[in-house]
C-alpha cells in the first residue's frame, strides 16, 4: 500500500525570511485589463497592502510545506490542527491584530463539504481512503491569506485531485488582479 500523498508538488524554492522588507512575487500572469489610473498616493498605499499580503502568503506557504509531510494515515485530526497552528505562531507570533493565525483550521473529509474542525479529545484519524481538504488562514494587518489544499493517499482519487487543481488554476487566470 502506497501511503504517499498524491498531487502535492515538490517544493522548489526555499522559504523566505518573514522579516524581509521585500517579498518578490512567486508567480505572475499577464492581464490585459488592469487598473492603470492610480495616482502616487494610491500606489504607495497599494504597495504597503501588497507587502502585507505577500508576507501573509509566504507564511502560509511555509506552514503548508511544514504540515504536508506530517499527513499520513493514522494521524489524529487534532494533532495536525495543533501542529499547523503552532507553526503559524512560531513564524508570525501570537494571533493578534498585527499578524498571526487568520482563522482556525478546518477540515473537510470525504462527504463533509466544509468547515469541520478537530475539538479537544477528538479521536478521529486520517485514513488511507480519505480525501482531505485542509483549510487555514494567516494574516498580516488584517490581510488574510485564506487557502486550502486537498490530499489523498489512494491513487483512485488522483483524477479528482488533478481536475480540481486544473479548475482552480483556470479560475485564477480568468479572474485577474482587478476582480472585487
Residue ranges of predicted features:
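Active-site neighborhoods and metal-handling regions in enzymes and metal-associated proteins
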Residues: 1-180
